[in-house]
């Protein structure tokens, strides 16, 4: 009895040393990091509440998808909660945190806006290091955008260049370089990182859907996955196409569950009374606004 207790105590005491020496995080450590009382998560709730909510939704998507392909759900949940901590450096520059004070990007040129958006990766890695978060979380922070293009500001820059060319013949700015508007990477290199990479894009896009239905969600995810695959974002990841398909189906199910209150159901006159129909329509408009 005493030997068993001592052995257990020794194992628990040795875990931090093992994790530090081999740069691995056990499920026990990762599970502890899902506690919302972690200083970084508490800070995010106050300084970047939109990002905090986004991270919770990404965690739900990633955890369920991990279960569907035999990846580590605890790792996915923990890493998802911290993947966007770098946004706390300049929270107002990210859509989910912008309120009545407007969009600060309106005062920036596209290249500067892209630089600010991309900087949340570097800021996040630094915060993770300062708070001694496991190496795997730092990997996810670094990889969760891969080398994707910050499309909005790239297209904005191209449009401005085109307008200058039409107006002045000789534009006073260089033609936009696509590499300036791409994240530095690396691309996702392990299954859990790739799952969070997709979950991050899916949650942000689904939040903006004007109408929520099985068809609209499925079409949205199909476009996101197709775009990322054609862009070569999974070239360094061991995920198979079969696993990618399972992840996509898991995302569809989880997204529909998360957005359930916004789903517009077809009206069946035989089942719905006029008052019920009016109530459902009003609720759906209120939720979507």
Say what each PLM segment does.
Residues 1-6, 131, 251-263:
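C-terminal domain-closing interface element
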Residues 1-49:
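Generic detector of multi-pass transmembrane helix bundles and their immediately adjacent loops
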Residues 41-214, 218, 223, 227-231:
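Divalent metal-dependent catalytic cores for phosphoryl transfer on phosphate-bearing substrates
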Residues 69, 231-235, 260-264:
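Active-site phosphate-binding and catalytic loops of NTP-dependent enzymes
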Residues 231-256:
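Cytosolic regulatory/linker segments at or just downstream of nucleotide-handling modules
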Residues 265, 269-270:
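C-terminal amphipathic alpha-helical interaction region
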Residues 272-274:
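Cytosol/matrix-facing juxtamembrane amphipathic
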Residues 276-289:
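Long, low-complexity, intrinsically disordered segments
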């Amino acid at each position: 009895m005493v030997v068993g207790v001592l052995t257990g105590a020794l194992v628990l005491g040795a875990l931090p040393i093992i994790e530090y020496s081999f740069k691995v995080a056990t499920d026990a450590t990762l599970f502890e990091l899902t506690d919302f009382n972690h200083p970084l998560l508490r800070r995010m709730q106050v300084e970047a509440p939109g990002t905090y909510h986004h991270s919770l939704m990404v965690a739900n998507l990633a955890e369920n998808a991990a279960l569907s392909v035999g990846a580590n759900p605890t790792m996915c949940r923990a890493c998802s909660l911290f993947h966007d901590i770098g946004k706390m450096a300049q929270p107002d520059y990210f859509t989910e945190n912008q309120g009545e004070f407007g969009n600060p990007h309106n005062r920036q040129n596209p290249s500067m806006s892209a630089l600010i958006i991309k900087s949340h990766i570097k800021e996040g890695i630094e915060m993770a290091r300062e708070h001694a978060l496991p190496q795997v979380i730092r990997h996810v922070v670094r990889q969760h955008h891969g080398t994707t293009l910050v499309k909005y500001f790239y297209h904005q820059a191209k449009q401005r260049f085109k307008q200058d060319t039409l107006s002045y013949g000789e534009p006073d700015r260089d033609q936009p370089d696509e590499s300036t508007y791409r994240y530095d990477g690396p691309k996702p290199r392990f299954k859990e990182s790739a799952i969070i990479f997709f979950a991050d894009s899916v949650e942000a896009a689904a939040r903006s859907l004007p109408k929520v239905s099985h068809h609209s969600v499925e079409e949205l995810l199909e476009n996101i996955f197709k775009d990322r695959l054609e862009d070569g974002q999974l070239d360094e990841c061991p995920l198979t196409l079969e696993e990618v398909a399972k992840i996509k189906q898991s995302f569809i199910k989880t997204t529909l569950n998360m957005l359930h209150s916004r789903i517009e159901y077809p009206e069946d006159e035989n089942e719905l009374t006029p008052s019920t129909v009016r109530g459902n329509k009003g609720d759906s408009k209120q939720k979507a606004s």
